[in-house]
C-alpha cells in the first residue's frame, strides 16, 4: 500500500515537473511575426529551429529570429515595438523592454512610453530608446546606426568611445563670406585650415555614453565612433524598409498616435512640483 502511494506521488511530481519545464522552456510571450517572406525561422532556448511560414507565429523571451538570404520578417512586440529584419539578420528577444541585435540590417520603430527606457543591445554598444525610428547595421562592411527620428542614448560595453563629430560645410561658407573682403584667397585658405584644425580638436570627445540626434549616422570601428549627417544611402534604406512593411507600418503608426498624443498632452513637471 505504501509502495503504491509512493509511486503515485512520484508520478504526480513528475507530471508537475514536466509541466513546469514546458512552461519555463516556452518563455514569456513577447509578440508575433506579422509577416514573413523567404527563409525565416526561430531558434528557441533549447536550440531547436522552427520554420516561420506565415503571419501569427508567436515570439517569446529567449527566441532568436533569423532570416536567410532573400528572407524578410516583420515582428510586432507587445511593449510597443515594430521591427523589420532584412535578409541575413538575427534578432534575439530578451525580457520586456530589451532586444539584442546579433547581426545584419534591422529596422526598429518604438512608440513613446510612460514607464521607462527600452534598450537594444548590439555587439558594439547598448542603445537606450524613447519613441525612436532607426536602423542598426552589423555585417562585414560596417557597424553603424542611422537615426531617422527621436533620440538615442549610446553606451559603451567597455572603455570610453573616441567620438569624432563632423562639422557642416556651411561653417566654412560662413567663415569665407566674413573674411573674403579682407583677405586674399591664399591667406584665407591658410586661416581656414587653422580654423578647421581647431574645430577638429574641439569635436573629438572621449565618453562612455553620449546622445545621438535625429537625422544622423554613427559608425563604429572598435572604440572609435564617427558621426555624420544622414546620407542618401541611409535614407534609401529607410525607404526600402518602409516599403517592405507597407500597410503594417501604417497600422502600427495609427495605433501609436493616440498614445503619443496622450503623452505629449501631459503637463511637464518642474522641480518645485516634487518639493
Region spans (language model):
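C-terminal interaction modules
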Residues: 2-14, 23-29, 47-55, 60, ...
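Short N-terminal segments immediately surrounding and downstream of signal-peptide cleavage
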Residues: 27-43
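Generic short beta-strand segments
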Residues: 38-40, 70-72, 132
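Active-site/binding-pocket entry motifs
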Residues: 39-41, 91, 107-108, 135
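Short, small-residue-rich packing micro-motifs
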Residues: 59, 65-127, 145-154
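Active-site glycine-rich loop that binds ribose-phosphate moieties when present
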Residues: 128-134
